[in-house]
């Protein structure tokens, strides 16, 4: 077994040759390298698969033996300072390694087709492989110095991937925003690392925790300084995991390609912050004020993220705020000391969110042939709807991820989220009420995203994409916006776009659909987009290719079954809770009791309330977002409640307030823009003025003064040597007299 652990160093380094070789190939042999691009993609997936198999082998050994292995090499050794590099294989490392590799393989396989027509295909795979390498290096690090090095590499990769389409101004601004926001957290992390080294004299986790706990228990260190250093360490996690108030970069990060969003939100960028808190939890747990602060940030973030997701029109931004909220649950759990619950939710959320993002990518991919390649249109849920009949596999997978995130049993997130909710009652009733209320909001906005995207009729048919700013036949109701009425006649004519299968073959068929001349004239300005130069014109979205659907289906299976990893179950004295056995060494390090989990019956009984709240959120979403065009009738159930009156006006005000809150991002971004961005620019202008006029002005002024004095003397001398000599001797005599009187 120890021989297997000795090769743990290959985990971060095995995927590294691919980005290096791609970079060298593009520099030295660009044409040949691009011609072999599918081979490089295969190599990326292959090497990451080897790491996944190796990580699974290590995990099985850890479950059976509850072992921890660390290997270090001494790099710098002297009397005052020593630095070691190595790797640490413990349950947290193996869990994160499996998470990164499995999600990474699915995303890379998906990206082969998704990015196939992009000129930056090879650059994309180089960035993605290096991203996985950096994250694997982070989770295997054995000390704080390595953590910081790979932490910065992860940030650099996210900057490159978010700004992958750097020619688009929005993408360029988004990657800069992510970079600058994370600079704040990274600077705090660096100061915290230096402060902890000042206290303990070590960067190694194995020594650091023992020394730190000993100093705290013996009261041999300034508690205020210790708390401040721990707070600085937590600042790094706040920025990386998009926690309040450094969450502003996350929705803008959606400007990158969708596979990047899936990897960032599931297993790399945002997971790095959760990993850091979990890794340093033995340090945080002995400082009660820090634990309380961590839980406070978590509860604020989970509620804020849920409210911001309520009225988003962009499908990816809605999922981004969902990620922010779910990360808040994990931070809350870690702040409460629920180590197992936090990691369990990290696992289940990763697969569910990767499924949702890849599903949204499939939807966006299919919508692009209708509305063009502008993200403002292809990602707009107001232009979707009615996709069930066109993308049934994607719809089923997306529904699976939606129900999982809503907390519906027996899907993955149900088991992990309910553990956090149950633990929150024991920690703080106020926090518990907020967390449970947010569970209902989660079910509402996730169901809203699903309904707007897949149910009803294709709303793109009701918009004019001819390039002229004509009034659309019907405005699309999302929230806070009124839909204009259309006549029943026009509506029925537009419904003819939904052609009978007996009259029209599939859009994959070579035969075109024969439409009535009147209908053809109506839809001509709407839909006239050919797909990638093909002579065939697509009038409807289409299902993605198998290379994109296969990863979605695999992630769907993970979403179905990964929750059974941590189900609390004790059958005839045999503990079937695999996750608890896996985490035994880490839980023992935290001095927590490993036998605190409920049995399956008690857990199911406690979960009734949370499932009821989630069901209520789903019901409200169905009630509010039931498709208006659900039949050939203009009136349906919701229209019975839309008559004008005092209650209607009041409800409109509430909806408008929620819409404004969500669309303006809780007014936090405008606040930062007004008081920070503008303030920093004014400060920069002030310092520039001080530097140019004061700092540079003093030596320049002295030089000018000397110049004018010299010019004056020159004019007095008249250009004659005798005059210059007279002035020289007279001034010399004057200074000699002064010197004489001062010394005698």
From Swiss-Prot:
What does UniProt give as GO cellular component? chloroplast thylakoid membrane
Its record classes its membrane topology as: Multi-pass membrane protein
Q: Is Ligase tagged as a keyword?
A: no
Q: Which GO terms describe its biological process?
A: ATP synthesis coupled electron transport; electron transport coupled proton transport
Q: What EC number(s) are associated with this protein in UniProt?
A: 7.1.1.-
| Catalytic function, reaction form | a plastoquinone + NADH + (n+1) H(+)(in) = a plastoquinol + NAD(+) + n H(+)(out); a plastoquinone + NADPH + (n+1) H(+)(in) = a plastoquinol + NADP(+) + n H(+)(out)
- The primary location reported for this protein is plastid
Cellular compartment(s): Plastid, Chloroplast thylakoid membrane
Q: Which keywords annotate this record?
A: Chloroplast, Membrane, NAD, NADP, Plastid, Plastoquinone, Quinone, Thylakoid, Translocase, Transmembrane, Transmembrane helix, Transport
Q: Which InterPro entries match?
A: NADH_UbQ_OxRdtase_chlpt_su5_C (IPR002128), NADHpl_OxRdtase_5_subgr (IPR018393), ND/Mrp_TM (IPR001750), NU5C-like (IPR003945), Proton_antipo_N (IPR001516)
Q: Any stretches that span the bilayer, and where are they?
A: 9-29, 40-60, 88-108, 125-145, 147-167, 185-205, 219-239, 258-278, 290-312, 327-347, 354-374, 396-416, 425-445, 548-568, 608-628, 724-744
Among the GO molecular function terms of this UniProt record, one is: NADH dehydrogenase (ubiquinone) activity
Lineage: superkingdom? Eukaryota
Q: What class of enzyme is it?
A: translocase
What does the function comment of this entry state? NDH shuttles electrons from NAD(P)H:plastoquinone, via FMN and iron-sulfur (Fe-S) centers, to quinones in the photosynthetic chain and possibly in a chloroplast respiratory chain. The immediate electron acceptor for the enzyme in this species is believed to be plastoquinone. Couples the redox reaction to proton translocation, and thus conserves the redox energy in a proton gradient.
Complexes and interactors: NDH is composed of at least 16 different subunits, 5 of which are encoded in the nucleus.
Q: Which family does it belong to?
A: Belongs to the complex I subunit 5 family.
Please give the name of this protein: NAD(P)H-quinone oxidoreductase subunit 5, chloroplastic
Species name for this entry?
Answer: Dampiera diversifolia
Q: Which gene encodes it?
A: ndhF
